[in-house]
Amino acid sequence: MLDIKWIRENPEKLDEALASRGIEPHAERLIALDLERRSHVVEVQCAQERRNSASKEIRQALAAGDQKTVERIKAEVEEIKTFLSSAAIKEKRLTESLEKILSAIPNIPLDSVPKGENEEANIVIRHFGTPPTFNFIPKEHFDLGQNLKQMNFERASRLSGARFTVLSGALARLERALGQFMLDVHVNEHGYEEISLPLLVRDEIVYGAAQLPKFSDDLFRTTDGRWLISTAEVPLVNLVNGEVLHESDLPLRFSSLTPCFRSEAGAAGRDTRGMLRQHQFWKVEMVSITTEEQSLIELERMTECAEDVLKRLELPFRTVVLSTGDMGFASCKTYDIEVWLPGQGCYREISSCSVCGDFQGRRMNARYRKDGDKTLHFVHSLNGSGTAIGRCLIAILENYQQADGSIIIPGALQPYMKGISRITA
């Protein structure tokens, strides 16, 4: 959530930033509503002060035996009580109206973010590896998996409907190995703390991560009003919800392996075949909680951590900085890492690393105190995929496929595969 004080002081910057995201101006409406709310608060404060002074005047009038004055002031106090009663309702309504609008406004892109309407304006900043060449036409992952008889979409559909997959045998082991490998890299070598999390969270937790109210249609909700997590970012970033930290405790770096659940309401007709876009998938997530001064440094570090996973797996990838029209709601800068998929003949997103500034910290009321400074500051938060396991499995199948349909296991994963170096039918 944005700071209304910043909006009052920078209305043009707000509207320019929103325009770069393809969103209509909001500054005038927000400032008018905020002015009405603040003016009303002043009226309430004046009424409360008058009520307090009236009590003193009543005591003085009683002492002087001036009953007429007592009755007049008592009548005035009753009017003030009536006003304050209705004023509380109005103040609540104004505050809720302001917060409703603020909660629907995305974060402000940093100046270093390229301006553009969509992914066409994204900028590639680096490559790793060279896409492999084959002496045969490379297959897509779903053909490879089904030919191996270890990837079954028909059974998954019978169990759960569209956009689910059943893996078996060595492919199921490969999926598990990827999660263990990624966690080991991030925890043992990158300094993240491993966290085991609930998969069901409450409204305020999803709101704190800036996924409510805007993305409610993309989420699954249980009958008791809780939400299945769409990413481990949601509970991880909220580990500091409502807390006051000390600067010396930061950064906090968390990593977690969880299933993720998404309705994919906005993806109708896209990637309908295979595992690229599923209602349920595994992902290793990274979250950092840090200070304003360190947040951009942390973004570069987090992105390098995600890239390191793909480098160890020797998968070709490129890293792009997203444009203002393509970046996520809570982000003020995002790097996407896109892995090469020979079967599709293109790069596809496998990780997204974002810095959110104090956007989530403000929603969560998560703050920190600096040495010698009594002022509390909202924490800055970052999140990144480290990486999406299903998409990494897809990349391994397509990049390591052989002419006979078998799959070579990357060397980094073989210790997790109990001696399996090649997957065959």
Swiss-Prot record:
Catalytic activity entry: tRNA(Ser) + L-serine + ATP = L-seryl-tRNA(Ser) + AMP + diphosphate + H(+); tRNA(Sec) + L-serine + ATP = L-seryl-tRNA(Sec) + AMP + diphosphate + H(+)
Entry keyword DNA-binding: no
SUPFAM superfamilies linked to this entry: Class II aaRS and biotin synthetases, tRNA-binding arm
GO molecular function terms listed in the Swiss-Prot or TrEMBL record: ATP binding; serine-tRNA ligase activity
Function per UniProt: Catalyzes the attachment of serine to tRNA(Ser). Is also able to aminoacylate tRNA(Sec) with serine, to form the misacylated tRNA L-seryl-tRNA(Sec), which will be further converted into selenocysteinyl-tRNA(Sec).
Positions of disulphide bridges: none
EC number: 6.1.1.11
Signal peptide residues on this chain, from the entry's feature table: none
Classification via PROSITE patterns: AA_TRNA_LIGASE_II (PS50862)
Comment text on domains: Consists of two distinct domains, a catalytic core and a N-terminal extension that is involved in tRNA binding.
Protein name: Serine--tRNA ligase
Pathway in which the depicted protein is active: Aminoacyl-tRNA biosynthesis; selenocysteinyl-tRNA(Sec) biosynthesis; L-seryl-tRNA(Sec) from L-serine and tRNA(Sec): step 1/1
Family as reported in the entry's similarity comment: Belongs to the class-II aminoacyl-tRNA synthetase family. Type-1 seryl-tRNA synthetase subfamily.
Source organism, top-level taxon: Bacteria
Gene name of the encoded protein: serS
